[in-house]
Design a protein with these regions (language model features):
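Cleavable N-terminal export/targeting peptides
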Residues: 1-38, 277-280
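Membrane-embedded beta-strand positions in outer-membrane beta-barrel channels/transporters
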Residues: 71, 75-77, 118-120, 160, ...
């Protein structure tokens, strides 16, 4: 009798132990889950795309196209992460570089009209709440100039604070505010045209084929004066980060040389996007 009772107890313990082990494995603390999310993000390549990279050409909207109002705009942008999320408050450090070119391909000799250089360094923190990645906050120091001298020189340095909110897996809202710390001699009024802050969103279709961006850049002053950028892209194939893109720009400050000139441009071409949401 005792022997049979011990056999039953042994069997019950054997059944219960795996279940107890499963409970211990599943019940992880909030901190452990947050750490695992950071570890997954830190495991991604150190070198990656930053802002959108594109090659688009087009002309003025609402006017007669000519060699003087038609052009090609090129942007390349990348980042190099310097650390993992091991700095205070789980932040990480990275370098970034963006270059923009305006190319007058419809004129004789095909001259480049302007080249804008935008290097910088940033300190970012992924924001994790309720066991989910919900956003990112970044403090950065940026330089932007066009590499020219004399009266054609345009440059400024600024401290920027940026934030991203991942509202849904396919929707991100973003905002960025900057404080200039050094102006170039010939562009001291650049805030009146290139703005003081921006806000926008990026939406991706459920089938990951379409991407829509809209950014509003507020120019200095109390009036409702914005520069507007809208981009619509269609993925070339399912496994590619290349898109066919339509881009619309309306306002001032599209590039540094002619930052005081109003532009309304529609362009079409190739877009190359980061794996996740783009930076702005």
């Amino acid at each position: 009798m005792i022997r049979h009772l011990l056999s039953v107890i042994t069997l019950l313990v054997g059944i219960a132990m795996p279940a107890m082990g499963q409970i211990v494995t599943i019940e992880r603390s909030t901190q452990e889950i947050a750490d695992s999310i950071r570890a997954e993000l830190d495991s991604r390549p150190y070198f990656s795309l930053y802002k959108d990279t594109y090659f688009v050409g087009g002309t003025v909207l609402g006017g007669k196209p000519s060699e003087y109002n038609s052009d090609v705009k090129i942007q390349i942008s990348f980042q190099q992460r310097l650390t993992k999320s091991v700095l205070p408050f789980h932040t990480y450090l990275y370098l970034f570089y963006t270059q923009k070119a305006i190319w007058h391909v419809f004129r004789n000799s095909l001259p480049f009209h302007d080249l804008n250089f935008n290097p910088g360094i940033g300190l970012s923190k992924h924001i994790i709440m309720k066991n989910k990645l919900v956003g990112k906050a970044t403090l950065m120091v940026e330089h932007e100039s066009n590499g020219k001298d004399g009266t054609k020189s345009r440059s400024w340095n600024k401290i920027s604070l940026a934030a991203e909110a991942y509202i849904a897996p396919q929707l991100m809202a973003h905002a960025k505010y900057w404080i200039p710390i050094v102006y170039g001699k010939y562009n001291k009024d650049i805030l009146d045209y290139s703005g003081i802050y921006q806000a926008g969103f990026q939406a991706i279709s459920n089938d990951n084929k379409w991407v829509l961006d809209m950014t509003l850049i507020k120019r200095r002053g109390w009036n409702l004066n914005f520069n507007t950028v809208v981009q619509l892209g269609y993925r070339i194939n399912h496994n590619s980060n290349q898109f066919i893109m339509l881009q619309y720009y309306n306002g001032y400050g599209e590039y540094m040389m002619d930052y005081k000139q109003y532009h309304s441009r529609i362009r079409f071409g190739l877009l190359i996007r980061p794996r996740f949401f783009s930076d702005f």
